[in-house]
Regions:
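Short loop/edge segments at beta-strand edges and connector loops
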Residues: 217-219, 285-287, 486
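FAD-dependent oxidoreductase catalytic-site/capping-region signature
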Residues: 3-8, 124, 130-180, 185-187, ...
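N-terminal glycine-rich phosphate/pyrophosphate-binding loop and immediately adjacent elements
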Residues: 2-128, 287, 297-299, 303-306
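Conserved redox-cofactor binding core of oxidoreductases
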Residues: 106, 111-231, 235-237, 301-326, ...
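Glycine-rich loop(s) and the adjacent beta-strand/alpha-helix scaffold that form part
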Residues: 29-33, 40-44, 50, 224, ...
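Classical protein tyrosine phosphatase
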Residues: 20-54, 119-122, 260-286, 425-430, ...
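Residue-level detector of alpha-helix initiation sites
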Residues: 12, 16-17, 21, 156, ...
Length: 542
């Protein structure tokens, strides 16, 4: 590399749920120099720390990558909005803050799927290391980690939802992140004193004064640089538009997320050779699995009008109520502003004979015609409304994400193929019937004035599936586009090293071979912890 290029031991691309962890953990060693590159801004907007403020961020291209899918054949050709975090903390700065590890047996299945070292016993220490959770069994829950996790305070709707689940026969559970990952409960959330606890706050804030850690924001990684088959640095576009390079004497660590990591691998010459030639990218290593195997959760929501003003809709309909809740939040860090609108959940089996739950259900404190609406004008219902929704935890539908331009600032092609597999359709219908049954229970029905979408009576299999196709949207849990496994059908090995080259790892949700259970943020933070383990072990080895 050019002698004038700034040199580091490690260059990390992306400061999201895993990249921030890596930057903090690697810079614990004062003898190494770490550079963290982030395309977005610092996470200084007040809407980041105020949980309910997330609605202001998800449509703002200063804080998210605004993208959408290709038309979805099985969703009546709808294009689904697909934002991801673009600031320090990445998507942990704009997600629902729901803290879910995943079912222990699914990690054991990772280990069996050519991912040695990834069983639940292997990953449990990393889960415990990342968290502080004051409740729960100390044999399974961390008590002194950077990410503060709390159980959400019950509100009338979440309490009713959990009780109604029990009335249908769903067990109630104190801690779904323990070995018994099944049943209904209040949500666990990554909150610190009523404020969002993203990875920037949890990991970068304590580390950023270290002399050996440099954090650069507003830069777009253009490609990974190679000498032969070894990654030696990163070329990036600086805020002034000038192309610069940073050298990595030890490793480049790609943490750009399930959408951007496969795109950047392709722009760096790692991917399907035919596709790379069409892009005009020199081939470094042919691997047709880059960008393939995409999996995501997709959720239909049943909307209801509430008999009492318990919902976020009510805040948007009344300045007085909005002001009252804001004052409550600023003085106590409690109330609706201390949530992202989701408080109660249930992990359930939609049919007999399953070894573990196959669906997650939830109650949300909003209703409307547009999921990310932030006002009555943009689609929030002009009445006290809420939804109950759910999704198949282990979708069989598979899609892809691929670069369509050599410009890293342009969104890639996103094709999740939602509900393309008949099993996904069958489970979706079954869980929607479960939601209807929950709404009919005494604990829940006393709070319901009417069903708004779909109306009561539209409960046949075809009607429910039709509604799901018309209204479902992403849960923002994409994975597997740089999946971990055997070299014959994967992108990285069980230590996250990219096949076919050296000096390059991927550490983010893109490496997950298949879905664990539900939300991906906490498992991705765990991936960051494990990646740091592997890198440190390799330092010690050599």
């Amino acid at each position: 590399m050019n002698s004038q290029v700034e040199k580091y031991d490690y260059v990390i691309i992306g400061s999201g749920s895993a990249g921030s962890v890596l930057a903090a953990r690697l810079s614990e060693n004062a003898g190494v120099k770490v550079l963290l590159l982030e395309a977005g801004k610092p996470d200084t907007s007040p809407f980041v720390r105020i949980p309910l403020g997330v609605g202001k961020l998800l449509n703002d291209d200063r804080y998210v990558w605004r993208a959408e899918t290709l038309p979805q054949k099985n969703l009546y050709d709808n294009k689904i909005y697909w934002p991801s975090g673009k600031m320090l903390g990445g998507s942990s700065s704009v997600n629902g803050m729901l803290a879910v590890r995943g079912h222990p047996k699914r990690f054991d299945e990772w280990r069996e799927a050519n991912c040695p070292g990834w069983g639940f016993d292997d990953v449990l220490p990393a889960f415990m290391r990342l968290e502080t959770y004051k409740e729960g069994n100390p044999a399974f829950r961390g008590k002194s980690g950077p990410v503060t996790i709390v159980k959400s305070r019950p509100n009338p709707l979440s309490a009713a939802f959990v009780s109604a689940c029990g009335q249908t026969g769903i067990p109630l559970v104190d801690d779904y992140n323990d070995l018994v990952a099944e049943g209904a409960s209040q949500m666990q959330m990554n909150l610190h004193d009523g404020r969002r606890c993203n990875t920037s706050f949890a990991y970068l804030k304590p580390a950023r004064r270290r002399h050996n850690l440099k954090i650069v924001t507003g830069v777009f990684a253009r490609r990974i640089l190679f000498e032969g088959m070894r990654a030696v640095g990163v070329e990036y576009i600086a805020p002034d538009g000038v192309t610069k390079s940073a050298g990595a004497s030890a490793e480049v660590l790609l943490c750009a997320g399930a959408t951007r990591s496969p795109q950047l691998l392709e722009l760096s010459g790692i991917g399907d050779a035919t596709r790379l030639r069409e892009l005009g990218v020199p081939i470094v290593h042919h691997n047709p699995h880059v960008g393939e195997h995409l999996q995501d959760h997709v959720m239909p929501r049943l909307n209801y009008e509430c008999v009492e003003p318990y919902t976020v809709n009510d805040l948007l309909r009344s300045r007085l109520r909005m002001g009252r809740e804001l004052l409550r939040y600023f003085f106590s860090h409690q109330g609706l502003f201390a949530t992202t609108g989701i408080a109660g959940t249930a992990f359930v089996r939609t049919r007999a004979g399953l070894a573990y739950p196959d669906a997650r259900l939830q109650v949300g404190l909003t209703s409307g015609t547009a999921r990310l609406a932030t006002s009555i004008k943009t689609g929030i219902d002009d009445f006290s409304g809420f939804h109950i929704g759910g999704y198949f935890l282990y979708p069989e539908s598979r899609g892809s994400i691929h670069a369509i331009s050599k410009d890293p600032r342009q969104s890639p092609s996103i094709q999740p193929n939602y509900l393309s597999h008949p099993v996904d359709q069958e489970v979706t219908v079954r869980l929607m019937k479960m939601l209807r049954k929950i709404a009919e229970q005494p604990a829940m029905s006393t709070l319901i004035k009417r069903a708004t979408r779909p109306p009561l009576g539209a409960d046949g299999d075809e009607e429910l599936l039709d509604y799901a196709r018309k209204t479902s949207s992403t849960c923002w849990h994409p994975i597997a586009t740089c999946r971990m496994g055997a070299e014959v059908d994967s992108v990285v090995d069980s230590r996250m090293r990219v096949y076919g080259v050296s000096g390059l790892r991927v550490a983010d949700a893109s490496i997950m071979p298949f879905q664990v259970s539900s939300n991906t943020n906490i498992p991705t933070i765990m991936l960051g912890e494990r990646a740091a383990e592997f890198v440190k072990q390799d330092i010690a080895r050599y």
